[in-house]
């Protein structure tokens, strides 16, 4: 048997974001005797050691914010010239994939995959304009197109959206099965009473996730539901701003900031509702995980309806009226719904990671035949 095909994944870093979580879920479940993952990153990440343990290699170049446009393009060019033995480059950088794949094409790498994980760029006017310029290279530079949802495909690939394939953000379903024992243990660890109403959110502290609105919702809820808590999992540039807002509203004892955690499957057991008021998303892995644990989800109507696993757990709400969210939270909290769901529901929707990994295994092998 020959050596495995080495696929180069391109990301900013391998931290616990949605795209990165999907990549690691794939890596753990793919047939590594046939396919190995290497990574081109710009910064250290929490998954780096696991990648090395699984047999992957990590390459590093400075990101565009560290040296500017021309320095970044030069580094990409030099990297791909020195590493043109790769047969497959799989870029997860949304619009910025244009620069990555253009350099890979010039270096003669035959298979160049653009993967869309979002439906909108972050940043101000200048940043978005620059990203549009970067993204304009994708159509000429990519050979294959993948997306987490139809909306994500239309946003990044435009005219090529119909040529794209959907790669569903699968999860390890057994890990997220509800456990009352785990629920009680986590609540005890967090200092939360058994009979409290617990709202949860998992995501980076950035503009996209709309944490400020989430705090406003909880502030209103607290006025009518005194035994309620909000648990925030994640980190990011806006965390200190949100912490300051929590202090101003005197909610410190009721809002818990947990930072980046590796035990999301356990934390979800402690929640009563999952609240997700994002301005935009591709198709969040964390919402699949929440539904996998039987958790009712109130989410922004800006998020694609493709995220609903048809288990009667998801409700879409507008993000211009906090009172609507409070009313829905109170209504759901009065229901005694079972958290025990059938894994078949996720399986039938195609969100079992074993299916996703099998699809990618065949996809990569087909590319190099």
Residue ranges and their predicted role:
Residues 2-74, 79, 237-239, 363:
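N-terminal strand-loop element at the rim of the active site
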Residues 20-25, 197, 201-220, 237-243:
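A conserved mid-protein helix/loop that constitutes part of the nucleotide-sugar donor-binding site
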Residues 40-41, 296-300, 306:
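Short hydrophobic beta-strand element within catalytic cores of glycosyltransferases
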Residues 59, 140-181:
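Donor nucleotide-sugar binding/catalytic pocket of nucleotide-sugar-dependent glycosyltransferases
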Residues 66-71, 154-158, 170-189, 195, ...:
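Acidic anion/phosphate-binding donor-loop and adjacent secondary structure
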Residues 91-97, 116:
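Short His-centered aromatic/hydrophobic patch
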Residues 260, 279:
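Aromatic "clamp/platform" in nucleotide-sugar-dependent glycosyltransferases that forms part
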